[in-house]
Amino acid sequence: MTSANKSDKDRVVIFDTTLRDGEQCPGATMTFEEKLEVAEMLDDMGIDIIEAGFPIASVGDFEAVAEIAKNAKNAVIAGLARAIPGDIARAGEAVRHARRGRIHTFVSTSPIHLAHQMRKSEAEVLEIITATVTQARNLVEDVEWSAMDATRTPIDYLCKCVETAIAAGATTVNLPDTVGYAVPDEYRRMFRTIRERVPNADKAIFSVHCHDDLGLAVANSLAGVEGGARQVESTINGIGERAGNAALEEVVMAIKTRGDVMPYWCNVESTMLTRASKLVSAATSFPVQYNKAIVGRNAFAHESGIHQDGMLKNAQTYEIMTPESVGVKQTSLVMGKHSGRHAFQHKLEELGYKLAENQLQDAFVRFKALADRKKDIYDEDIVALVDEEMAASHDRIKLTSLTVIAGTHGPQRATMKLTVDGQTRIEEAEGNGPVDAVFNCIKRLVPHEAKLDLYQVHAVTHGTDAQAEVSVRLSQDGRAMTSKAADPDTLVASAKAYLGALNKIVMKHQRDVPSAAAAS
């Protein structure tokens, strides 16, 4: 669709909740700095609304929302709040410095939620809607109200709730498929019915928020738009509660690719989607599945002989969008040990990185060290290297050196040197295999109660000298933290990944201690 043909009534507002709903995915917790970096990326790529967090949840969440609100250049910054006065006041405080702030408040509306979670009558919930939306509207001009479990709410009562919320001042009404229960046709009909029956429906923008429990989140989101919704709530890589949310990159590219049947448009710069996907994957340490639509490693790969033949003759035979349209570069072999600093910086810019001078120098030193150990350097190697460098820049615990003795007989032994808060510590330990020895060594150096929930290894690229990328998930006190690290030496990568997750647990504990003290 050309700009001349664009109509405001067909514009779809993109609401990203990666930093709130996405982070609720077990193990996907991000550090304060990672949240700021992701928010900056989302703002730069044209996301209309960034739901930056749940301010009442912890001091760390409040600080992240407040800092993102101060720094945002273009996006509306939203803070989530339950239908509780204290929540709403806290959200209002968090977004008050934003150029454009929003309070997003929600309440359950379905019979099963009212009976077993809320323990309120329908009439009581209507009173809560009026009171809380009014309170939020007195704090900010932009208020979003959500009917939790809308798709399992009787339509007559849902209409009453929507009318009440709009009358109280809601500017956006979100009707989420909270448990991923709906199918596209019924979700489309729900929006059409409500927009037809609610007398003040024209006073608010309607929004979709779909979960992927039945694998229908994106399809339902698009169906909701066809039913009259003009805001889509989604997350990068589709991360989120349970099976996740509608994947933002899939929603955006469906709108951009199928303008012939969906006359809608959005402001998102699609060439930044792949970089955003990699950034969120690195921040959460959640790998993107290889066959993931739009941003997966195999999204533009063709192995079948018939497909390859067609691609060579005309790329459109098997590609409905160009790799470049989502930020995928066609060349993969890029750098070597003779590459200079300027070429390295140029490559980083191509990959979407903007590093400070000290970060650039540190990354270049690590790149040269990697190039001395590995013959061919690929884009994926550089991404892994820089993401690890940025993630480790605030770590309290850092790996200095590691030596492992392993063989077919006898116990395996690891000797490790760590820097902990600037102090050097050295220890050795045995284990049932080299990885176990490495992890036992860390436990001796930094005593902790964290439990190892996940340990995975895969090659970043191909070849026997490929970097190993290791994912580790640790849990402690009900919190799960995941980290990834890459190195040509699998044991070094394993140690770095374990330490990365441990650093996240330490940092999360530090930020949440004031919250616990304040609550007591």
UniProtKB/Swiss-Prot annotation:
PROSITE patterns xref list: AIPM_HOMOCIT_SYNTH_1, AIPM_HOMOCIT_SYNTH_2, PYR_CT
UniProt keyword Cytoplasm, yes or no: yes
CDD domains for this protein: DRE_TIM_IPMS
Cofactor(s) it depends on: Mn(2+)
Chain positions covered by the region annotation Regulatory domain: 398-520
UniProt keyword annotations, A-Z: Amino-acid biosynthesis, Branched-chain amino acid biosynthesis, Cytoplasm, Leucine biosynthesis, Manganese, Metal-binding, Transferase
Pathway of action: Amino-acid biosynthesis; L-leucine biosynthesis; L-leucine from 3-methyl-2-oxobutanoate: step 1/4
Pfam families assigned: HCS_D2, HMGL-like, LeuA_dimer
GO molecular function, one term: 2-isopropylmalate synthase activity
Annotated binding of Mn(2+), by residue: D21, H209, H211, N245
Keyword Cell wall biogenesis/degradation: no
Cellular location(s): Cytoplasm
Ranges for domain Pyruvate carboxyltransferase: 12-274
Reaction(s) this enzyme catalyzes, per UniProt: 3-methyl-2-oxobutanoate + acetyl-CoA + H2O = (2S)-2-isopropylmalate + CoA + H(+)
Gene Ontology biological process terms, A to Z: L-leucine biosynthetic process
Gene Ontology CC, one term: cytosol
HAMAP family per UniProt: LeuA_type1
Similarity section: Belongs to the alpha-IPM synthase/homocitrate synthase family. LeuA type 1 subfamily.
Quaternary structure note: Homodimer.
UniProt function note: Catalyzes the condensation of the acetyl group of acetyl-CoA with 3-methyl-2-oxobutanoate (2-ketoisovalerate) to form 3-carboxy-3-hydroxy-4-methylpentanoate (2-isopropylmalate).
Protein name: 2-isopropylmalate synthase
Organism in which the protein naturally occurs: Nitrobacter hamburgensis (strain DSM 10229 / NCIMB 13809 / X14)
Name of the coding gene: leuA
